[in-house]
Structures are given as structure tokens and as C-alpha cells.
A protein has these predicted regions:
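N-terminal Rossmann-like NAD(P) cofactor-binding subdomain of oxidoreductases
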Residues: 1-161, 165
Length: 166
């Protein structure tokens, strides 16, 4: 695949900084620079926009085949269809979605259920992708009657970090 565009609400300097430095992978060894409204990643020039209105995105003009919807703000077919109406061929949610999407896929577990007529798909949650492949293997090999997991997650924008009753 080829990275064809990035739409990020953060300003261009922040996008470039976050592309250059990663807390897990360290500093990107190649070139990251800004050139007007383009993000230069080595020799690849990627159009960078900051459009909050999905319906106003120029996916058709840019020839976008697949939008990775990673905001977490959009979770249903209606909002995904805004990307489709803007010219994208398909939408993949990087997070859990509502039940009105074509499928929720956990790679290696139910990948075979994907079909070419699906245009809005969810990749499930990070916890699901960490646990379900292992659990599926255990279930197929030994059988699993019940399971409980505990996940420790970094603070995100949506949970309340303190007891509101205090």
C-alpha cells in the first residue's frame, strides 16, 4: 500500500514531531519534514489536512482506496459513509464499531469472513486483538468453558480518571 493522505486535527508541526519521535520505536531514522501542506517522509510527499468535517475531505480527488478511521470518535456506518461519500473506496475502523458495520475482524481468527463487497469494517479493539487469537488457539486445542481477563490501559480521553462521587 501507499500512504496517500493524512487528515489530523493537530497542527502540522505536531504531526511532524509525532512522526519523527515515538515512545515505543524511538526516533524515525529517515527524513521527516514539512513542505507547505505536505508531510515529507523520506522521499514520499503526503498531503496533510486538518479537516474536522469528514464530509468535506477530498478522498475522491486524492484517489483514496481505503481510509483508516483512527479517531475513535466515529463508530457507526453512518459516519463511515461520510468517508465513502467523500470518495473513499472503503473504511477500516481501528477500534470497535457499532453492529451496523459489515464485519468486525480479528486478524487470524475470522479473517476468512471478509468479502470484497464489504466497505465498512472494524478491526475490533486492541484488547480483543491481544487476547482473542490466543484464546481461539487454546479453545481449539483444549477447549475453553469460561475465561476472564484483566487489562491495564493507559488513560485515554473518554474514561473518567477519578471517582466523580468524591
Amino acid at each position: 500500500f501507499e500512504l496517500a493522505a493524512i487528515n489530523e486535527i493537530a497542527d502540522a508541526n505536531t504531526v511532524a514531531h509525532l512522526a519523527r519521535y515515538d515512545s515505543n520505536y524511538g526516533r524515525y531514522p529517515g527524513r521527516i519534514a514539512l513542505s507547505g501542506s505536505l508531510l515529507a517522509i523520506d522521499h514520499l510527499l503526503v498531503p496533510l489536512s486538518h479537516e474536522p468535517d469528514v464530509a468535506a475531505l477530498p478522498w475522491g480527488d486524492l484517489g483514496i482506496d481505503l481510509v483508516f478511521e483512527c479517531t475513535g470518535a466515529f463508530t457507526d456506518r453512518a459516519t463511515a459513509e461520510q468517508h465513502l461519500h467523500s470518495g473513499a473506496g472503503r473504511v477500516l475502523f481501528s477500534h470497535p464499531a457499532e453492529s451496523d458495520v459489515d464485519a468486525t475482524i480479528v486478524y487470524g481468527v475470522n479473517t476468512e469472513t471478509l468479502s470484497v463487497d464489504m466497505d465498512v469494517v472494524s478491526a475490533a479493539s486492541c484488547t480483543t486483538n491481544a487476547v482473542v487469537p490466543v484464546l481461539a488457539t487454546l479453545s481449539e486445542t483444549f477447549g475453553v468453558e469460561a475465561a476472564t481477563i484483566t487489562t491495564i490501559h493507559s488513560l485515554m480521553n473518554d474514561p473518567i480518571s477519578a471517582d466523580p462521587s468524591v
